[in-house]
Design a protein with these regions (language model features):
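Membrane-embedded, hydrophobic transmembrane alpha-helices
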Residues: 1-69, 73, 90, 439, ...
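Transmembrane-helix signature of polytopic, membrane-embedded enzymes
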Residues: 4-14, 167, 184-207, 226, ...
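Membrane-interface helix-loop-helix junctions at transmembrane boundaries of multi-pass membrane enzymes
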Residues: 66-84, 189-197, 242-250, 283-294, ...
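Hydrophobic, aromatic-rich transmembrane alpha-helices
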Residues: 180, 184-188, 280, 354-401, ...
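Transmembrane helical bundles and short interhelical boundary loops of multi-pass, membrane-embedded
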Residues: 238, 281, 353-366, 443-551, ...
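Perimembrane helix-loop-helix junctions
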Residues: 271-300
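Short periplasmic/luminal acceptor-recognition loop of GT-C membrane glycosyltransferases, typified by
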Residues: 535-542, 546-586, 612-620
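Luminal/periplasmic acceptor-recognition loop/helix of membrane-associated glycosyltransferases
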Residues: 572-624, 642-648
Length: 663
């Protein structure tokens, strides 16, 4: 599809098409209820053989038709270029150290990020348990999470299906981190500044919020950033020369990456829409129709599944959004929680003082002003550029940030910093654009930019959120991280070695052999240390979960009911091998939504209909008090109720009756 691509881009394309193949095959099988190990294995093997057969043969090293454009006065062997490479290498290992530390901590303590245990992993577990990706999985009473795209959850579910645990989920985002760094390198390599653009991306990837909520967790922000950067990398790299038009095959390849991003989460629609607007300006006039057909086909195949599922089930691709023209409108389902828009508060000095400035510090670390200022400068600096490829990067970055500011977010303005990661793609593109634009001026400006980026990453390491709590686990963690770091160095050496020659003698294979040995030893240490279930978290809901763990409850049906507090803790009640069936229940509403139970009869009837063995109940404000209702039911035996009376755990020991309920 993209013949004669440089080696780094070839590696990136292999990763993208592997993920696309895995995603599409899983979605197709899941639609007919065949998301199982044997059908997956057969289908993936056939798809892999098909891709290998149609893939174009690569060029010999050094014979690629895609040319790079070195910055003026900066040769590959210059002091500036060498300094940039070494600083980039150090930055990569710093960022990997942050992410691997958090990942290893997650192996020890379990996944604890709210969104992970609220809907990411429960959705993935349901895919693996039911074998279906087509059914809507009710998560809570908000009418939001049930309709989210689940591209990342499918990948988690594949790991659960093959391994029987969520161990793969805890390391998946480190893989996306590496993809993001590789894509950033590919973007800059077109202008001969690959290490500098990699460093620019590392500035964002090292920020406290991304590390805290994505590293070792099941959130998908890093996946979206990596996929959008990959689409940009294909677009800016695959034109044969400056001013040349983008080939149709490259448009389709970029569409694959963009489609995967759109199928991962709704905020990715903004950069994907911006790319769609830019595609006609990057291809020949006579090729625009065919290129757009390929682009939209790739988007629909790789990212349209979840929107089609919503459309069939409830009558809208994005149910919370008002979509329509004139009298024709799709179904709109209003979220069951308050929302806010950041743009409405931008003119308030009080909000800036109390929320925005402290939030920026929390999200981006001590050097937040540098991250924001350099990113904004990169988007503005595009005015001086004369290339469409640089314009498209700045346009996508600006569109992502503007869409984030305009979009309605959940809860209220005091929670804005929790969603700032949605703008990470735009911030990263701003920094990358800044690196490219400034480095083309002179060697001095490149060194100055290098100093800014390096100092920003260094300053970020002094943020207490990154290291303070993570080094309390013990020396084994340090040992494990050191082993994994060594493995990464060996793998990096193998990749560099392979990129220089196609001959693999004993010397060339040595780094690969070392990497395999180190990973094997590290895996042994990890298995001895691995704790599958949330040993480090102290959330109140865990008291009920630990009661079930002590009873060794497996292969049981567990119902949860209550507010978002109960819904946000449901993954705690899965066992180590994910055999428990955990379901949030509520009074049925329209369009696959639920609400709090308002009477005892409906609540008890729902438990009986679901044949649940255990019920975890939260007593909400108002008439909804399932704990009192269960206490009045002779078929429910109380196992645990917390001192506040808010959370209760009950075992269903006999047939339930709907009459005579207390309330």
């Amino acid at each position: 599809m993209v013949p004669d691509a440089p080696v780094p881009l070839e590696r990136l394309l292999v990763i993208l098409f592997t993920v696309a193949c895995l995603t599409v095959v899983s979605e197709v099988l899941g639609t007919v209820g065949l998301f199982r190990v044997v059908p997956l294995t057969i289908a993936l093997a056939c798809a892999g053989l098909g891709l290998a057969k149609i893939a174009p043969a690569g060029s010999a090293p050094g014979q690629h038709s895609i040319r790079t454009e070195a910055p003026p006065g900066i040769g590959a062997g210059s002091i500036t270029a060498q300094t940039t490479k070494w600083v980039a290498v150090v930055a990569v290992f710093v960022v990997l150290g942050e992410w691997l530390t958090a990942t290893v901590l997650a192996l020890h303590n379990g996944v604890t990020a709210l969104d992970s245990i609220w809907y990411h992993l429960p959705t993935a577990a349901r895919f693996a348990q039911s074998g279906s990706t087509w059914r809507l999985h009710v998560i809570d009473t908000t009418s939001l999470a049930v309709f989210y795209p689940a591209g990342s959850e499918v990948i988690h579910a594949v790991g659960m299906e093959f391994l029987g645990t969520d161990a793969l989920s805890r390391g998946l985002n480190v893989g996306w981190l590496i993809v993001g760094l590789l894509a950033a390198w590919c973007i800059g390599s077109r202008w001969g500044v690959g290490p500098l653009t990699l460093l620019a991306a590392a500035v964002v990837f090292a920020t406290p919020q991304l590390v805290r909520v994505d590293a070792g967790q099941a959130l998908n922000d890093m996946q979206v950033v990596a996929l959008v950067l990959s689409a940009i990398a294909i677009i800016v790299t695959c034109a044969p020369a400056q001013g040349s038009w983008l080939p149709r095959g490259s448009v389709a390849a970029a569409g694959v990456a963009a489609g995967l991003a759109a199928g991962t989460k709704w905020p990715a629609l903004a950069p994907v829409a911006a790319l769609t607007i830019g595609i006609p300006f990057l291809v020949r006039r006579g090729d625009r129709v065919r290129s757009l057909v390929l682009w939209f086909a790739a988007l629909l195949v790789c990212g349209g599944y979840w929107y089609a599922r919503n459309l069939v089930h409830v009558g809208s691709p994005i149910p919370p959004l008002r979509i329509g023209i004139g009298r024709i409108h799709f179904t709109q389902i209003h979220p069951g929680l308050p929302t806010f828009s950041i743009v409405h508060s931008l003119a308030s000095s009080g909000v800036w003082r109390r929320q925005f400035l402290p939030g920026l510090r929390l999200v981006f670390g001590p050097a937040w002003w540098s991250v924001v200022a350099l990113s904004a400068a990169g988007i503005v600096a595009v005015v001086a550029a004369r290339e469409r490829r640089i314009w498209i990067m700045a346009f996508v970055g600006a569109a992502t940030v503007i869409a984030y500011l305009l979009t309605e977010q959940a809860f209220d303005i005091t929670q804005w910093s929790a969603t700032a990661r949605f703008a990470a793609t735009g911030i990263a593109l701003g920094l990358i654009t800044f690196a490219i634009a400034v480095s083309r001026l002179s060697a001095k400006t490149q060194l100055l930019t290098l100093a800014f980026f390096g100092t920003t990453i260094l300053a970020t390491q002094f943020d207490a959120q990154l290291w303070k709590a993570w080094w309390r686990v013990g020396g084994l963690k340090v040992f494990f991280v050191a082993l994994v770091g060594t493995a990464f160095m060996a793998i990096a050496g193998a990749v560099v070695s392979a990129s220089r020659t196609t001959r693999f003698g004993p010397v060339r294979l040595a780094p690969v052999i070392v990497a395999l040995v180190v990973v094997s030893v590290a895996a042994g240490a990890a298995l001895d240390w691995y704790q599958p279930r949330f040993s480090g978290s102290r959330l109140p809901m865990l008291a009920a979960a630990r009661k079930l763990q002590k009873r060794h409850v497996v292969h049981s049906r567990i119902a949860l009911t209550g507010t978002l507090y109960a819904a946000g803790s449901q993954y705690y009640f899965y066992d180590k091998r994910l055999t428990n069936y955990v379901q949030f229940i509520g009074a049925p509403g329209a369009h696959h939504t639920v609400r709090l139970f308002q009477n005892c009869e409906a609540f008890i009837g729902s438990i009986a209909a679901g044949r649940y063995d255990y019920v975890v109940a939260e007593a909400a404000a108002g008439p909804s008090n399932p704990i009192r209702w269960l206490r009045s039911d002779p078929a429910a035996r109380e196992i645990f109720v917390d001192p506040s009376g808010r959370i209760g755990l009950f075992e269903i020991v006999g047939p339930q009756r709907r009459t005579g309920c207390a309330g």
